[in-house]
Amino acid sequence: MSDVSGKVNLLNFDHKSMREYLESIGEKPFRADQIMKWIYHFGYSDFEQMTNINKKLREKLQRNCIISAPDISEKQVSEDGTIKYALKLEGGQEVETVWIPENDRATLCVSSQVGCALECTFCATAQQGFNRNLSMAEIIGQVWRVANDIGATRIAGTRPITNIVMMGMGEPLLNMKNLIPALDTMLNDLGYGLSKRRVTVSTSGVVPALDMLKAKIDCALAISIHAPNNKLRDELVPINKKYPLEDFIAAAGRYIEGSKANKQATIEYVMLDHVNDSTDQAHELAHALKGLPSKINLIPFNPYPGSPYSRSSNSRIDRFDKVLQSYGLTVITRRTRGEDIDAACGQLAGDVFDRTKRSVINAAKNAEISSLKNQPKADTISIKVV
């Protein structure tokens, strides 16, 4: 829970653990409620600004605690108003977060990991490989940092963050330990107070974790399918070899059963030209989804350097859409946002990968140089930078 300063980062606590921490240092648990309001409603990180907390406690917090979110290392604004943030983490790694304003809402796309281990062949993040899970502070800190940057605290009263989607870098369900308390803070009235239907977790098919999520928290669900059968999905989404499509769809059905956040699951389907976009495949997809209450988001593929795929033509997308609608399915073709700054779906990584890789290599070199200085002269040391 501590950062490099040795202080406890309060962004690593949800409401329950914040109360437990305050009790552990001899304070009344209601103080946690006050502190959370200052952090998330006002966007404060300075304990001296928390004026309804007595001076003695403020001084104790100042000595032992910190409110630390990832810093903005780069900010790019798209022609359509979308903003992509590169946020710097401890250790020099970076993740990307995207704020997408629309007429009646503003959605924040949040990352859960540095890189991703699932190796989906059409996704830029997957090409980066997996580095590590984000801490709770690094997940909720993305929301806190962007909210402060755009002035979207409750007190400011400006354009708020109305929706959060866990659709950034990484597979959220492979970081359950830190995802759950972060989601709780997004939903809790002492945190961001969003409704269950406005916080969405997207998964590519970690079936056991999806069942665990149901037992832990109720929020909106999006499932990334991208293929109508196991043969093609094995190629596009390799985790399908472990958890086949029919098991994934069944798990989604179990999740939305009894859910107050979901009347239906959102199906994410990236449109790859002449790969998964034929009318025959549309029929096959409709049959695969039979029995699952769902709406389908068709996502035009967003190209990135080195990708072997192309975006489906509008005519192929339209034909695919019409076939699905003929089965009575609700279908939406997602409008691509932030493409000019590589902030669109499937594009997150880019320069962040290059900077992260350089920072890791430099850190490794510095560590090896330091160890060399501390070794006896007679020793022979082999240095290998990965």
UniProtKB/Swiss-Prot annotation:
The active site is at E96 (proton acceptor), C345 (s-methylcysteine intermediate). Keywords: 4Fe-4S, Cytoplasm, Disulfide bond, Iron, Iron-sulfur, Metal-binding, Methyltransferase, rRNA processing, S-adenosyl-L-methionine, Transferase, tRNA processing. SUPFAM superfamilies: Radical SAM enzymes. Its EC number is 2.1.1.192. Transmembrane segments: none annotated. One of its GO terms (cellular component) is cytoplasm. It catalyses: adenosine(2503) in 23S rRNA + 2 reduced [2Fe-2S]-[ferredoxin] + 2 S-adenosyl-L-methionine = 2-methyladenosine(2503) in 23S rRNA + 5'-deoxyadenosine + L-methionine + 2 oxidized [2Fe-2S]-[ferredoxin] + S-adenosyl-L-homocysteine; adenosine(37) in tRNA + 2 reduced [2Fe-2S]-[ferredoxin] + 2 S-adenosyl-L-methionine = 2-methyladenosine(37) in tRNA + 5'-deoxyadenosine + L-methionine + 2 oxidized [2Fe-2S]-[ferredoxin] + S-adenosyl-L-homocysteine. One of its GO terms (molecular function) is 4 iron, 4 sulfur cluster binding. Reaction proceeds by a ping-pong mechanism involving intermediate methylation of a conserved cysteine residue. This is Dual-specificity RNA methyltransferase RlmN.
